[in-house]
Amino acid sequence: MLYIFRLIVTVIYSILVCVFGSIYCLFSPRNPKHVATFGHMFGRLAPLFGLKVECRKPADAENYGNAIYIANHQNNYDMVTAANIVQPPTVTVGKKSLLWIPFFGQLYWLTGNLLIDRNNRAKAHSTIAAVVNHFKKRRISIWMFPEGTRSRGRGLLPFKTGAFHAAIAAGVPIIPVCVSNTSNKVNLNRLNNGLVIVEMLPPVDVSEYGKDQVRELAAHCRALMEQKIAELDKEVAEREATGKV
């Protein structure tokens, strides 16, 4: 019964946000500030799923300039966990096929997110150039999932290099965002599904990395994130075991 209730409320809420959000965005289409606004709105679904989301970020995070945010990509619950920490004006890079999801796809495009064709390598490379161009023209940040796909309980997957190519070419820092494990954590028939911690790490300076050191930069960032995620998972387990959620 709880499962059905959650499903109905989620569908109704999501459709309302997407429909009225799309209408709202028509007054200033493709404005990158919209992404954080509606990301946080989807983040409000976390309590409905029985999740307590705890966000941590550096004190001066709101003053960061242009940057590329990278986060671990686990499952669809990223929409209600990681979305809570998105800073304006940040846009995401997603698959072109997202555009065809009813209601959501239209909002995704109108909020200013970038769409890439993963099946066309040439177009994917041109997207990196477009990202760099965006940085040169305006104050904007980009959010990317360097794993390229949902990990679904397989741990932190190997990183693709697109985000790191773009960061070096644009001369902007990389800001890792780490989310504690959510794989097999949510049971929609269970009232309380525990704690999820989302932590933003300090910026990684890319100025010391050349174009031929992209993989080194990717490996460095992945190591930072892997260590932090392990720490967060340990903390979550300890707090849930002692009831200090």
Swiss-Prot record:
Protein name per the record: 1-acyl-sn-glycerol-3-phosphate acyltransferase
The protein's Enzyme Commission number: 2.3.1.51
Membrane topology: Peripheral membrane protein
GO aspect biological process, one term: phosphatidic acid biosynthetic process
Manganese listed as a keyword: no
Gene name per UniProt: plsC
Entry function: Converts lysophosphatidic acid (LPA) into phosphatidic acid by incorporating an acyl moiety at the 2 position. This enzyme can utilize either acyl-CoA or acyl-acyl-carrier-protein as the fatty acyl donor.
The protein's annotated pathway: Phospholipid metabolism; CDP-diacylglycerol biosynthesis; CDP-diacylglycerol from sn-glycerol 3-phosphate: step 2/3
Record carries keyword Lipid metabolism: yes
CDD domains: LPLAT_AGPAT-like
A Pfam family annotated for this UniProt entry: Acyltransferase
Catalytic reaction annotation: a 1-acyl-sn-glycero-3-phosphate + an acyl-CoA = a 1,2-diacyl-sn-glycero-3-phosphate + CoA
Annotated source species: Salmonella typhimurium (strain LT2 / SGSC1412 / ATCC 700720)
Family affiliation: Belongs to the 1-acyl-sn-glycerol-3-phosphate acyltransferase family.
GO MF assignments: 1-acylglycerol-3-phosphate O-acyltransferase activity
A single cellular component GO annotation: plasma membrane
Enzyme class: transferase
